[in-house]
Amino acid sequence: MDTLAGILQVASVVLVLVLVHRPLGDLMARMYESRHDTRVERGIYRLIGVDPRSEQTWPAYLRAVLAFSLVGVLVVYGMQRLQAFLPYALGLPAVPEGISFNTAVSFVTNTNWQSYSPEATMGYTVQLAGLAVQNFVSAAVGIAVAIALVRGFARTRSGTIGNMWVDLIRGSLRLLLPLSLVTAVVLIAGGVIQNFAGFQDVQTLAGGTQTIPGGPVASQEAIKMLGTNGGGFFNANSAHPFEDPTAWTSAFQVLLMLVIPFSLPRTFGKMVGDTRQGTAIAAVMATIAVASLTALTLFELQGAGSAPMAAGAAMEGKEQRVGIIGSALFGTVSTLTSTGAVNSMHDSYTALGGMMPMLNMMLGEVAPGGVGSGLYGMLVLAVIAVFVAGLLVGRTPEYLGKKIGPREIKLASLYILVTPILVLVGTALSFAIPAVRDDVEGTSILNSGLHGLSEVVYAFTSAANNNGSAFAGLTASTPWFTTALGVAMLLGRFVPIVLVLALAGSLAAQDRIPTTSGTLPTHRPQFVGLLIGVTVIVTALTYFPVLALGPLAEGLAS
């Protein structure tokens, strides 16, 4: 794909986003504020014994999230261990214990990290009834938590932040399921396969034999992208022609990753009664995304070495049908959201090019972030930003009429610290414990030296931020990585959720402070610039030393 075609691809995605984010954002606001339940929803409420008109305090909301997620982990783990007895197992045996644990945690936490080859490990029943179901509900949980935080800003003197079961079911049935159905049909029209055929041996033109996999790919591909999940039906993920056959399906999948996260700021603005606030948040997200895409594209177009110079760009690990700009667009969006899907191999990027997906995740995946998690992550950073602004002018910080006191700033600060601790401690332990270090260096790391460090840092960054992409040169199916990354995924998902829901409860209980001449206007360009600065300084600089030891040093040495 040439440069002009790549630019047109980016422009088309931006244009469609501009057109759809407003109606979709308004739709989600009405959906989560509605007091009307459909007949199907009422039947589900009766089945699980939930009163949809009864709201929950933040601890009750949290308990529901944790209980539901725990059941999800147990069900997905059990299905993998019993796979040999399930229909459509394709003759595949039970999944080993370590990988079963890692995979169950991965899909329940919306990470979709895959330390296995899907087409050679998972039968169709596990794929559809286990993993695909979690693609829906894990995304719905993320949106529900974001909506709970928005209610915290919107409500006054309230002890409740909504009903988790209502938010979960509405997000699944009214939003994700209909969109996925339409999306799957479009993907099938674009050439993505959808069947229940097993492996087929065919004769190639060269006279040999090749095994061709089948499967219900389009139905899973739709929610994989819409829910910013990212787990592929095939090991090559969206680089596989059965998942992403053409340049336009690649652009369409980029749009799917962005459409809900970029519409949620509009939902936020509608629910707090000031759409300008949502526009400001979306502007921050868009600015960071454009800067990241530009940097990655330039690094890959100007790759050093004789092969990139001969090809005109760094084409290693990239599909010709997608090209440099299409690969950079997909990789940027996949790591700025929590998707983690790939249509090119991030481990094959140039040193500085490979740093960009890593840095995108280190920013906290807030531009626009995953479905739900991106919005609540950016709102936490907004709390930090107004606190910094308050310190600069000597006023009590407030955001949307809510006072940002000691409790709120402690919760926001702890939120910021969670993922850096998981990433840096996990990486350090991988090299500090002698037995683990020997296994990591001898078994897991494909590339020694600076790039080997980058592979491990990338793995923990991806797991702790619930992204799921990888520097695939790292063998992550060892006992250390399946366990350590599983723990990182759990803590990286649920500790921030605890803090966000506690923040939502604290804000909802407050009265609203009247706006005065000294109130910081949080819908103007000055605040947009401040929030961008806080996002970059508070999060990215935390990782500067480890980036200097890995991709930066590798880039300078190349």
Curated annotation (Swiss-Prot):
Name the InterPro entries on file. KdpA (IPR004623)
Carries keyword Cell inner membrane? no
Q: Pfam families, alphabetically?
A: KdpA
Q: Where in the cell is it found?
A: Cell membrane
How does the record classify its membrane topology?
A: Multi-pass membrane protein
Query: PANTHER family from the xrefs?
Result: POTASSIUM-TRANSPORTING ATPASE A CHAIN, POTASSIUM-TRANSPORTING ATPASE POTASSIUM-BINDING SUBUNIT
Q: HAMAP family, per this entry? A: KdpA (MF_00275)
Q: What is this protein called?
A: Potassium-transporting ATPase potassium-binding subunit
Q: Tell me the organism's taxonomic lineage.
A: Bacteria, Bacillati, Actinomycetota, Actinomycetes, Micrococcales
